[in-house]
């Protein structure tokens, strides 16, 4: 076990109240120690490294200037919250990040009073902060609200909706735009620091308010002329004309790694008590750790790593990942069909569409963190005869549900939806679990909904989606590696709405939707050994259901169990509805539906989550035995 870093100053800081006792001159050393602590912790657990390293000075400055937790501090997404957790009473648990029963990798209300609003999905902080700021006004409270949002999250429409509303309400809200894209070089020198202090001070704001009153008195024409001159003059020096026109005081850009810049600006904004204010802070992802500075993209989310070399631990996979199988199959099909295009919402690497972009750069589009736009953009392409693959994580597809319904499904447009990270995702917990896509897509008329049982099936589904022009079609697959099956040279076109029998039996039928098929086959071995002859079927489709297959299973078995890594209301619910409507439950057929439990399951390894849910080999066997009134035989499902 490597030795913990020496952190004499950080050892004095348990909560922000302790931090506020330090002198300004001590803060650079504190920042170095927080970085050392964070690097050591994440090297042991894995997690999001680069974003947190980039906001160490900013986080310290905010907690130094503002009276948290009475003043509310909200982080957008939360990838950058690790320094915040270290400084807010959670340092003793920081090496449990993203582990079972450990600290969340995001802010969580249930975890600390210093986390006033939970985060994990993008672009929510300004809206939540505005709600809190208005609540403070209604309470006649002087508490401040600070929302920290990254430049990536500012690409989503929700952020601008909130900015527009905050400006119209003249809310006492402080928005800090953390610009770590390195598209703007951090300003340096005394003059830029002076201008930022001047722009945030009472004198400038008072003069600006006086100017507004004067121009209003003089009339609309002079108002427009003077306002335009003032705003463009400020925009020329410090930027921010757009934010000013939304009603925000704009300050910056300022160096987010300089306490000489951060502290006076934050103190001015705190003491002015006005709003809304937007402070543009420029930071560097991975700041203070050379490997992360040199390759920010590779150190955004990391496995466990060696602190000295930066080398990340890599487990040699037994099979290709589902994401890579999807990507390779799509590139293969795109080589043969120039109507195929790919769309991602700021996740080209995560979804595998970076491979399509490399092969066909003009046919792959990263639209930023804008899932709603991504789906309707895909609908427009489909309306013109193209074959768009809108590749999204299951949890992020939720953000675009109205567009899926209104712009795609109602119009019957053949948009293809590869749904990655379906089911349990492990360390990111309930905010990123792919729980609901089957349930919310199967409610839509005319939607084809598939799930891959293994990596070969995924390849078939890519080709099936390419060939299908009858309306929208989706196929889901999990995070991680496949099961190691033989791979076809090219996928086959599946018959829509038809499943398959994988193993024949006579007494119990296990009907799987998705990758739980492997556990169903293992469970069938145990059930056969216990004298319960078991059929295993792969549904392939949740919509349209394979009615013939379901009838066959119901009529020739004493018991049918549906198994899926999804929520209540999905595949199993549709099977149950069909069986009830057909009267196939009237003669005593035992039916059970295994799904993800109706709770928000906390972070753990996916295999542990499936075991807890009863979706693994042992859980399936146990369900059968309980339904039949039998105890689990010794040695079965061991």
Swiss-Prot record:
Q: How is the cofactor bound?
A: Binds 1 Mg(2+) ion per subunit. Binds 1 thiamine pyrophosphate per subunit.
Q: Name one GO molecular function term.
A: 1-deoxy-D-xylulose-5-phosphate synthase activity
List of residues binding Mg(2+)? 151, 180
The record's section on Pfam families has:
DXP_synthase_N (PF13292), Transket_pyr (PF02779), Transketolase_C (PF02780)
- A GO biological process this protein is involved in? terpenoid biosynthetic process
Q: In which pathway does it act?
A: Metabolic intermediate biosynthesis; 1-deoxy-D-xylulose 5-phosphate biosynthesis; 1-deoxy-D-xylulose 5-phosphate from D-glyceraldehyde 3-phosphate and pyruvate: step 1/1
Q: Which family does it belong to?
A: Belongs to the transketolase family. DXPS subfamily.
Q: Can you state the subunit structure given in the record? A: Homodimer.
Question: Could you tell me what this protein does?
Answer: Catalyzes the acyloin condensation reaction between C atoms 2 and 3 of pyruvate and glyceraldehyde 3-phosphate to yield 1-deoxy-D-xylulose-5-phosphate (DXP).
PANTHER family (alphabetical) = 1-D-DEOXYXYLULOSE 5-PHOSPHATE SYNTHASE-RELATED, 1-DEOXY-D-XYLULOSE-5-PHOSPHATE SYNTHASE, CHLOROPLASTIC
Its name, as the record gives it, is 1-deoxy-D-xylulose-5-phosphate synthase
């Amino acid at each position: 076990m490597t030795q913990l870093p020496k952190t004499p100053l950080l050892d004095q800081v348990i909560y922000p109240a302790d931090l506020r006792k330090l002198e300004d001159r001590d803060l650079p050393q504190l920042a170095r120690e927080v970085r050392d602590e964070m690097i050591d912790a994440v090297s042991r657990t894995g997690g999001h490294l680069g974003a947190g390293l980039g906001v160490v000075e900013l986080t310290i400055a905010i907690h130094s200037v503002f009276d948290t937790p009475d003043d509310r501090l909200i982080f957008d997404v939360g990838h950058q919250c690790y320094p915040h957790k270290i400084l807010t009473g959670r340092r003793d648990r920081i090496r449990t990040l993203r582990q079972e029963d450990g600290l969340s990798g995001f802010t969580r209300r249930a975890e600390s009073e210093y986390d006033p609003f939970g985060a994990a999905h993008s672009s929510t902080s300004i809206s939540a902060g505005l709600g809190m700021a208005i609540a403070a006004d209604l309470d006649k409270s002087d508490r401040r609200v600070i929302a920290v949002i990254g430049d990536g999250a500012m690409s989503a429409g929700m952020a601008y909706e909130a900015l527009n509303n905050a400006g119209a309400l003249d809310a006492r809200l402080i928005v800090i735009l953390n610009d770590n894209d390195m598209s703007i070089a951090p300003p340096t020198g005394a003059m830029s620091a002076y201008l930022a202090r001047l722009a945030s001070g009472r004198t400038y704001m008072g003069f600006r308010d006086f100017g507004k009153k004067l121009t209003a008195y003089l009339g609309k024409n002079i108002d427009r002329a003077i306002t335009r001159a003032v705003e463009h003059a400020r925009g020329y020096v410090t930027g921010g004309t757009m934010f000013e026109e939304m009603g925000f005081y704009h300050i910056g850009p300022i160096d987010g790694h300089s306490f000489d810049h951060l502290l006076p600006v934050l103190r001015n904004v705190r003491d002015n008590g006005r709003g809304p204010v937007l402070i543009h802070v420029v930071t560097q992802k991975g700041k203070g750790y050379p490997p992360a500075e040199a390759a920010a993209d590779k150190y955004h989310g990391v496995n466990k790593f060696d602190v000295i070399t930066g080398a990340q631990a890599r487990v040699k996979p037994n099979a290709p990942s589902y994401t890579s199988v999807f990507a390779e199959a799509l590139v293969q099909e795109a080589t043969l069909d120039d109507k195929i295009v790919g769309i991602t919402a700021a996740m080209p690497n995560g979804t595998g569409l970076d491979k399509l972009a490399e092969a066909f750069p003009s046919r792959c589009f990263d639209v930023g963190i804008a899932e709603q736009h991504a789906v309707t953009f895909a609908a427009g392409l489909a309306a013109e005869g193209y074959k768009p693959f809108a590749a999204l994580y299951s949890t992020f597809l939720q953000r675009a549900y109205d567009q899926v319904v209104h712009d795609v499904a109602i119009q019957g447009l053949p948009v293809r939806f590869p749904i990655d990270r379906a089911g349990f995702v492990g360390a990111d917990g309930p905010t990123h679990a792919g729980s609901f896509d089957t349930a919310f897509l199967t409610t839509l008329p005319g939607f084809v909904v598939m799930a891959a049982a293994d990596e070969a099936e995924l390849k078939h589904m890519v080709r099936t989606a390419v060939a299908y022009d009858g309306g929208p079609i989706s196929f889901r697959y999990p995070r991680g590696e496949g099961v190691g099956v033989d791979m076809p040279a090219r996928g086959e076109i599946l018959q829509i709405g038809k499943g398959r029998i994988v193993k024949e039996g006579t007494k119990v039928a296990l009907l799987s939707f998705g990758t739980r098929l492997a556990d169903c086959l293992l469970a069938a071995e145990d059930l056969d050994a216990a004298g319960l002859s078991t059929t295993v079927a792969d549904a392939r489709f949740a919509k349209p259901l394979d009615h013939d297959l379901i009838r066959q299973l119901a009529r020739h078995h004493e018991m049918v169990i549906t198994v899926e890594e999804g929520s209540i209301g999905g595949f199993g619910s549709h099977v149950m509805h069909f069986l009830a409507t057909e009267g196939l439950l009237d003669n005593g057929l035992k039916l059970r539906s295994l799904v993800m439990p109706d709770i928000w399951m906390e972070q753990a390894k996916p295999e542990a989550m499936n075991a807890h849910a009863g979706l693994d080999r042992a859980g399936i066997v146990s369900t059968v035995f309980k339904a039949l009134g039998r105890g689990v035989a010794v040695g079965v499902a061991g």
